[in-house]
Amino acid sequence: MEKRMKELVDKLNQYAKEYYTEDNPSVSDAEYDKLYRELVTLEAEHPELVQADSPTHRVGGLVLDGFEKYQHEYPLYSLQDAFSREELDAFDKRIKSEFPNADYMAELKIDGLSISLTYVDGILQVGATRGDGSVGENITENVKRISDIPLKLDQPLNITVRGECYLPRAEFERINTQRQENGEAEFANPRNAAAGTLRQLDTKVVAERRLATFFYQEAGPTERLTQNDVLNEVAELGFSVNPRRIVTSSMDEIWDFIQAVGQDRDHLAYDIDGVVIKVNSLAMQEELGFTVKAPRWAIAYKFPAEEKEAKLLSVDWQVGRTGVVTPTANLTPVQLAGTTVSRATLHNVDYITEKDIRIGDTVIVYKAGDIIPAVLRVVESKRTTQEAMPVPSQCPSCGSGLLHFEDEVALRCINPSCPAQIKEGLIHFASRDAMNISGMGPSVVEKLFKAELVKEVADIYGLNSQDFLQLEGFKEKSAEKLYAAIQASKENSAEKLLYGLGIRHVGAKVSKQLLESFGTIKELASADVQAIAAVDGLGEVIAKSIQRYFAKEEAQVLLKELESYGVNLSYLGQKVTDDAILSGKTVVLTGKLEHLKRSEAKAKLEALGAKVTGSVSKKTDLVVAGSDAGSKLEKAQSLGIEVKDEAWLLDL
């Protein structure tokens, strides 16, 4: 019986690969269904013999409690964007200055969601979202329901692959037609539908929506020599790989490829938002390295934004967490880049004045970066009104007088008790990059604020699960889950809290730099401007902003309240001191490490005071080389740079 079940699993997986990945089925649907039903029957009779890669796992049926966080072993980076031929030429010039013979691979930029799949001994173990690039969500049960993802590889490999999950246009239309018939809200575009589907707790819904994938990367060390080799290998392993790509050293040929793709864009079976250009040689990629956010060896050309005419009906003025008042246009609905748009940003009051935008105007609307709808300009030939846009003099939230500082383009409310600012501040405090309180999004904050359960961030920690049961949509389990998330956030390292406080000019990166230096928020709060400005050369603008914030009595009271609730005010990483063993040193990691994950090695080096970079240069002080180290090691040796091994790092 076990032999027959294995035979059925192998056959059905092969047939599924032919159908979904290769688009070349060798059996009829009826034959497939017959074998599938036989397998379902046998698995029901012998549940102890069900295989990990059985296609029956794709059907759904599980209802998940939620998604666990997942730490990526290798970060998922963003890409540098380009919007013109000139920017591509500048990229080409930079690459060719170091590697005159470099060639590139250009491929389609699928408009979907990044996913990472990890296989152990050839069996799918983890499927995860990109998240912030370092930490995503474990969505393994959902990716198992995507038909073109192999549950088992033909070889017993330990491998992590990255790709894009998307919803085909035909499937998007089918789902929206069905939702319309059911009286449900339609999805705005295929990307939103794919995102909502991947985060579904009901796996049956995921199986029904027929998501698809294209894979483009193997994470970590590989024996392949080029990006194109990687794609060929990934395809051979059974993953879907987009066939439309070119390899060339000529930016002229890449530009021709981009133009051809742009002409075909509307006729593809899926949405794309550009073309990705990568240095083809993996050795060159390694030597070029990364910036904080993106690889230096790749760039994403974004197609020019689609533009449409719409009538400007009215303007809403909205208050952000820093008091900036932003105008948003209400428009006659238009279809724009696959989305129905009826609202668009007008940026700020100076933009309205500069463009002479008026109520009743016909305006050109586009999507900035293919994401945010914005008003570009007025079609003056269609103007019917002579009245200038009315600009508010009072805050639409609290009624306080608005100020327009000479050095700012926006109106600003400076009332610290403004309800809109407080609500936006609470949303920011709970956000992923700040205190990361899962489940406390804008709608929940709105409900808490309306019920007068929170008026400032410290109030969040005075809530209990019973408080949430007062709110619409909460049941015992969801209330307990949110309460647990709040309690867990107390243990965050203090840079998360510092960022969450919303101090002007203090982002997530600056928060970490400050806490690495001062160790605790209390130490930072009592520091003078000179001491703060000296941290990594942050400067006086940031330093004065921090000092002004902590000089306020309400900020001092807030810190005491947070501490009384047990919120951690200390940096949990290792404080970097001037006498740290690697203080001021620039270090490069290369090769395969046997005992440490690359992220762990990087964290240890940074804790010892090092600045870890992705490429070797004359400014590099030290290279830590693992096995199979390539061109970076060779370059370090040619420059006479000190080289250490992993054992040295472990002993520190």
Swiss-Prot record:
Cofactor: Mg(2+); Mn(2+)
BRCT domain sequence ranges: 577-652
Keywords: DNA damage, DNA repair, DNA replication, Ligase, Magnesium, Manganese, Metal-binding, NAD, Zinc
GO cellular component annotations of the record: cytosol
Matches recorded under NCBIfam families: dnlj, PRK07956.1
Binding site for Zn(2+): 395, 398, 413, 418
Active site: 109
Catalyzed chemical reaction(s): NAD(+) + (deoxyribonucleotide)n-3'-hydroxyl + 5'-phospho-(deoxyribonucleotide)m = (deoxyribonucleotide)n+m + AMP + beta-nicotinamide D-nucleotide
Record function comment: DNA ligase that catalyzes the formation of phosphodiester linkages between 5'-phosphoryl and 3'-hydroxyl groups in double-stranded DNA using NAD as a coenzyme and as the energy source for the reaction. It is essential for DNA replication and repair of damaged DNA.
Protein name (database record): DNA ligase
Family under the similarity heading: Belongs to the NAD-dependent DNA ligase family. LigA subfamily.
Cross-referenced Gene3D superfamilies: 5' to 3' exonuclease, C-terminal subdomain (1.10.150.20), 6.20.10.30, BRCT domain (3.40.50.10190), DNA ligase/mRNA capping enzyme (3.30.470.30), Helix hairpin bin (1.10.287.610), Nucleic acid-binding proteins (2.40.50.140)
MF terms in GO: DNA binding; DNA ligase (NAD+) activity; metal ion binding
Residues annotated to bind NAD(+): 29-33, 78-79, 107, 130, 164, 278, 302
Gene Ontology BP terms: DNA repair; DNA replication
Database matches in PROSITE patterns: BRCT, DNA_LIGASE_N1, DNA_LIGASE_N2
